[in-house]
Every structure is written in C-alpha cells, then in structure tokens.
C-alpha cells in the first residue's frame, strides 16, 4: 500500500509544482530550480511501479513453488497493487503524449 501512496504523493507534488509555475509571473530571466525536476519525479514513479511489479512477481513465484508463509490473499493483493499502479502510470503516459500533441499542433 505504501508504494501506491508514494505514487499518489508524487502525483500531488507534480500537481503542486504545476500550480506554482502557473501562478508565478512570467519574467525574462530564467531562475534555477532547486527542487527535483519533472523528469526526476517521473523516473521515480516509473521505478516505484517497476519495484511493485517485481515484488508481485516474486511473491507469485514463491506461492507457486509452495513456499511456506506465502498466502494467496497476499499474492492477489500484491498483484492488484501492481496492476493498478501500472494502469495509473499508463494514464500518466497517455496524458503526457496528449499534452505533447496539443503543444505540437499549436500555431506559432
């Protein structure tokens, strides 16, 4: 659950950064950003989804070979967490692609 919470926290941080950027007045000089960049945050989110999927696969494999202490409910919950996090990442990707296409179609 904490990985899903971390992903949600990253999404909220990105939204807050977007709102801050939109509320600041436009200036001619470019200021250095001291926080993490969007690319870093997106990379962290992708890595967390990857970690969730790997943990789910390991738990599934452990259950399949009959390792003691691995419960079917844990396997199913882990599998659903991995599925939901991947679907969320796919939606983020789709929104990024759509935003890129919208920008590219803007008249100059």
From Swiss-Prot:
GO terms for cellular component: bacterial-type flagellum basal body. It comes from Pseudomonas fluorescens (strain ATCC BAA-477 / NRRL B-23932 / Pf-5). Belongs to the FliE family. GO terms for molecular function: cytoskeletal motor activity; structural molecule activity. InterPro entries: FliE. HAMAP family: FliE. Coiled coil: none annotated. Its main location: other. It is found in: Bacterial flagellum basal body. Keywords: Bacterial flagellum. This is Flagellar hook-basal body complex protein FliE. GO terms for biological process: bacterial-type flagellum-dependent cell motility.
């Amino acid at each position: 659950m904490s990985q899903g919470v971390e992903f949600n926290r990253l999404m909220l941080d990105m939204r807050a950064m977007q709102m801050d950027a939109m509320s600041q007045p436009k200036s001619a000089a470019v200021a250095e950003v001291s926080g993490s960049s969007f690319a870093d945050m997106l990379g962290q989110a992708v890595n967390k989804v990857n970690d969730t999927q790997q943990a789910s696969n390991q738990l599934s494999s452990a259950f399949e070979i009959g390792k003691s202490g691995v419960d079917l409910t844990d396997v199913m919950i882990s599998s659903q967490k991995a599925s939901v996090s991947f679907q969320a990442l796919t939606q983020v990707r789709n929104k990024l692609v759509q935003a890129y296409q919208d920008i590219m179609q803007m008249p100059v």
